[in-house]
Amino acid sequence: MADGIISVSYLSKIENNQVVPSEEVLRLLCQRLGINNILKNRQDELTSKLLLWYKTITDKNRQEAARMYEEIKRTFDDVQGAESIAYFLLFEMRYHLLLKDIHTVEALLIKLRELYDTFDDVMKYYYYKFLGLLYYCKEKYEDALEYYKKAEQRFRSQSFEKWEEADLHYLLALVYSRLWRILGCINYAQHALAIYQSEYDLKRSAECHILLGICYRRYGEVDQAIECYSLAHKIAQIINDTELLGTIEHNLGYLMSMKHEHYEAIQHYKKSLLYKRNSSLQARFITLFSLIKEYYVSKNYKKALANVEESLQLLKREKDGMTTYYEYYLHFTVYQYLLSEDISENEFETFMKDRVLPYFQRFKKYEDVAQYAEYLAIYYEKRHKYKLASKFYKMSYQFLKNMINI
């Protein structure tokens, strides 16, 4: 039976489960025996494993996704089927996006681009979707939207599970939110929410409620925003999800800040930080920065400065923190200048004009540009430099208009 394919001793090892044969060896042995369905069954089993792994990744179950990754990697040591390898690489890319391991994702992308011409439409759907997510993680939101839209085109011509449709629409809603395209965000978020509710996916339903709350807040619909956050809060308590509770408390803080209820805003931000004590530095910095701003506008400068210094220390202790979290380095340093008495005025001007404003303009973070241009205008006005003050007040106004007109 094995003549011309493998040695008798190797065949014996296969029969005794001492080695796992390659796909090619299995194919040749099956041909010799006149059996056609063994490879297909193995392929189907592998595809099912990969799709289950992908669903686990999409559900953000990091621990189980890591366990499955190691198990599937061992399986793939002997897999030579082009289709299986393509799906493995695609879902491996999605796994490393979950981990925010951008360096590994970009290395995988090189391999995937080499295989692109062999992809069918389903593979191309995943490819564009994950490429959109990569650009989203890199804060290149226009590029992210472009690739999500390409994925959406492929999605319409194929048959997918409803949860896949909901996930794509949620990602589209997220990127529309980042681009301040509020109607688009509401449309996709509501569609995703309807699917998640029909499938009793509580966590993803809560995420949609949070996103809708952000949209209504931006429209000034405070009561609707509170209703969305309240629904999300109830769900988060039911499923005991501290990560969600941290996000909800943060957004409630932002809402109270909009209403100039500074004490309530600060309490929500503090609760958020308690829930986020085991979260990523990125998640904690978002709330620390909001807390600093709230102390600043409520004129509690001592606590504002204490939080600035604590945040900068966290940055410095983190490996590559100053580059990984450069945006927050800029934010915290701006407030360090504003709150400190012994820093050179020329340093502040140079820092704002050469580093802060260009950075936030480049990444189209118009709210930050408007705020920091106003701070610079106030700085010049206090020093009777009215021409420069007028220039930066106009700049602030223009970027506020950009936010409204997006």
Curated annotation (Swiss-Prot):
Q: Which UniProt keywords apply?
A: Activator, DNA-binding, Repeat, TPR repeat, Transcription, Transcription regulation
Can you say where the TPR repeats lie in this chain? 125-158, 206-239, 246-279, 285-318
What SUPFAM superfamilies has UniProt attached to this entry?
lambda repressor-like DNA-binding domains, TPR-like
Membrane-spanning parts: none
Q: What induces it?
A: Expressed in the late logarithmic growth phase.
Q: Which InterPro entries match?
A: Cro/C1-type_HTH (IPR001387), Lambda_DNA-bd_dom_sf (IPR010982), TPR-like_helical_dom_sf (IPR011990), TPR_rpt (IPR019734)
The name of this protein is Transcriptional activator NprA
Q: Specify the species.
A: Geobacillus stearothermophilus (Bacillus stearothermophilus)
